[in-house]
UniProtKB/Swiss-Prot annotation:
Xref: SUPFAM superfamilies: Periplasmic binding protein-like II
Domain notes: Lacks the C-terminal regulatory region which is replaced by HisZ.
Lineage of producing organism: Bacteria, Pseudomonadati, Pseudomonadota, Gammaproteobacteria, Pseudomonadales
Subcellular location: Cytoplasm
UniProt protein name: ATP phosphoribosyltransferase
Family annotation (PANTHER family): ATP PHOSPHORIBOSYLTRANSFERASE (PTHR21403:SF8), ATP PHOSPHORIBOSYLTRANSFERASE ATP-PRTASE (PTHR21403)
Subunit and interaction comment: Heteromultimer composed of HisG and HisZ subunits.
Function per UniProt: Catalyzes the condensation of ATP and 5-phosphoribose 1-diphosphate to form N'-(5'-phosphoribosyl)-ATP (PR-ATP). Has a crucial role in the pathway because the rate of histidine biosynthesis seems to be controlled primarily by regulation of HisG enzymatic activity.
Reaction catalysis annotation: 1-(5-phospho-beta-D-ribosyl)-ATP + diphosphate = 5-phospho-alpha-D-ribose 1-diphosphate + ATP
Source taxon at top rank: Bacteria
Main location: cytoplasm
Organism the protein comes from: Ectopseudomonas mendocina (strain ymp) (Pseudomonas mendocina)
InterPro entries to which the protein is assigned, alphabetical: ATP_PRibTrfase_cat (IPR013820), ATP_PRibTrfase_CS (IPR018198), ATP_PRibTrfase_HisG (IPR001348), ATP_PRibTrfase_HisG_short (IPR024893)
E.C. numbers: 2.4.2.17
Amino acid sequence: MLTIALSKGRILDDTLPLLAAAGIEPTENPDKSRKLIIPTTQDDVRLLIVRATDVPTYVEHGAADLGVAGKDVLMEYGGQGLYEPLDLQIAKCKLMTAGKVGAPEPKGRLRVATKFVNVAKRYYAEQGRQVDIIKLYGSMELAPLVGLADKIIDVVDTGNTLRANGLEPQELIATISSRLIVNKASMKMQHGRIQALIETLRGAVEARHQG
């Protein structure tokens, strides 16, 4: 049995056509089904529907053989028990710092609000900057407006939400897209099968990119 961990939303919607190219299609619509384990048209392949931030955990610990996760999630997770063999080139966005429009660069210790705590620590450590990192789970844009933080680190797509709240994107930390990840033990135990799937998906990604 091959188990593939996916999260609902943009990543799921963009991944399903790629899996379909490999002959793997869910027997129920994941967006409408309440089931978290969904069979597919291949009897020995199933999908696990989990939170986006949990996909690497399921794969690293072997509860899923493969998964699809955003590079932002993988950068924050930092797990060692994963291979990342393929950039699926879907769900593209940018991980950036942002602050109030026209605000001067703060002197001294910087306050940064983000859900990407590990990414933020690494980023500012590389710059040699002293920071206080404030963990938030959502509505990052609010933090600079009410004096909770000087800057935020968040995923930026169009930037419209930032602009609507008087903020502007500033420094690019990473360009983000979704990646196929594979459990290291699964890769050894089912190497031929997983490698064949990787190559099929690679072909589907290239065809989609060229199309």
